[in-house]
Amino acid sequence: MTQLETRTEPMVVNFGPHHPSMHGVLRLVVTLDGEDVVDCEPVIGYLHRGMEKIAENRTNVMYVPYVSRMDYAAGMFYEAIVVNAPERLANIPVPKRASYIRVLMLELNRIANHLLWLGPFLADVGAQTPFFYIFREREMIYDLWEAATGQRLINNNYFRIGGVAADLPWGWLEKCKDFCDWFGPKIDEYEKLITNNPIFRRRIEGLGVIGREEAINWSLSGPMLRASGVPWDLRKVDHYECYDDFDWDVASEKEGDCFARYRVRIEEMRQSLKILRQACDMIPGGPTENLEAHRMAEGKDSAFAGFDYQYVAKKVAPTFKIPNGELYSRLESGKGEIGVFIQGNNDVTPWRFKIRAADSNNLQILPHILKGHKVADIMAILGSIDVIMGSVDR
């Protein structure tokens, strides 16, 4: 009896660019040997809009509304970095109150970013229930943003050179504290549902392992780096804004797998809540309604009319010129290090405006860590990286 030989040549499969678990318009050209991944080539660029070139043809005030559409889960972070770069180049001081307001917005955005990562990631690996819970919590963050900026998800257009566009509305800090009190137990609820679930743990433990040296050599940042045993957080390293005023810890794990990345993001949400609570209590001038009452009672000479109690140093004129020089400014977003290299030539628009997106760099290691895994693991590993194609393609 003759025995039929099975096919042994590799098979090439296309994932995306419109696959439901692709997290945007990413295409993966995957070479398979049976069920095993032999090679993977990411094809990017489907969402390229020329954001850097747009920046070089707009003034800063005109450009801020554009940037939140790059990464719609991290709009506030991109607004912050786009104003930080010219601010530092022109040595423009930021009032303490404005800095605290910025921190409040950034930490709310960090929680919103991690929630939008958590739901789809768990859905990718088969846990559907938390997917519906995360939108309930995000809705509360959107309500806070809508009260302060007028917009919910993107186009907040809130950050300005020297501060923010407007002070916090009356009662906003109380609502923010209410959110912190309400959200803390919800994180415990997620952990109860997921963290010690044996099916979930067997599904992702030991998957997509990245060692400490590998993470550093591939220039990873954010939870991808911290999950590999490198406690590197720009909020501690660069001392930007007023993060040094608060008591909080850098979340890190040592295993470097998908489960470690999940644990880091869960812990980061807890640390963000700690920062939010402290910022609400310590903000110079306190709630807006109290600050206004002090100013009205004490008149123009009141200490509460001083520089550090303002929400913006000085409103930026449309003719504000970015001085000669070049500078790289960076901050820690929910996905990692985002940065802007700006080159000014004493004009209202920058000569060069290079954007470093965290998920763009983090995505580069995907082919390296996919090799040897099963085809069913592709979505779990890709999901653990946390990419949004708007900022990868820019």
Curated annotation (Swiss-Prot):
Superkingdom as given in the UniProt entry: Bacteria
Species annotation: Synechococcus sp. (strain CC9311)
Official protein name in the record: NAD(P)H-quinone oxidoreductase subunit H
Family matches, as InterPro entries: NADH_Q_OxRdtase_suD, NADH_UbQ_OxRdtase_49kDa_CS, NDH1_su_D/H, NiFe-Hase_large
Location relative to the cell: Cellular thylakoid membrane
Gene for this chain: ndhH
GO function terms (MF aspect): NAD binding; oxidoreductase activity, acting on NAD(P)H, quinone or similar compound as acceptor; quinone binding
The reaction(s) this protein catalyses: a plastoquinone + NADH + (n+1) H(+)(in) = a plastoquinol + NAD(+) + n H(+)(out); a plastoquinone + NADPH + (n+1) H(+)(in) = a plastoquinol + NADP(+) + n H(+)(out)
Keywords in alphabetical order: Membrane, NAD, NADP, Plastoquinone, Quinone, Thylakoid, Translocase, Transport
Enzyme class: translocase
Gene Ontology terms: cellular component: plasma membrane-derived thylakoid membrane
Subunit comment: NDH-1 can be composed of about 15 different subunits; different subcomplexes with different compositions have been identified which probably have different functions.
Disulfide-bonded cysteines: none
Keyword Hydrolase: no
Entry EC number(s): 7.1.1.-
Family (UniProt): Belongs to the complex I 49 kDa subunit family.
One Gene Ontology biological process: photosynthesis, light reaction
Membrane topology type: Peripheral membrane protein
Major location category of this protein: membrane
Protein's job: NDH-1 shuttles electrons from an unknown electron donor, via FMN and iron-sulfur (Fe-S) centers, to quinones in the respiratory and/or the photosynthetic chain. The immediate electron acceptor for the enzyme in this species is believed to be plastoquinone. Couples the redox reaction to proton translocation, and thus conserves the redox energy in a proton gradient. Cyanobacterial NDH-1 also plays a role in inorganic carbon-concentration.
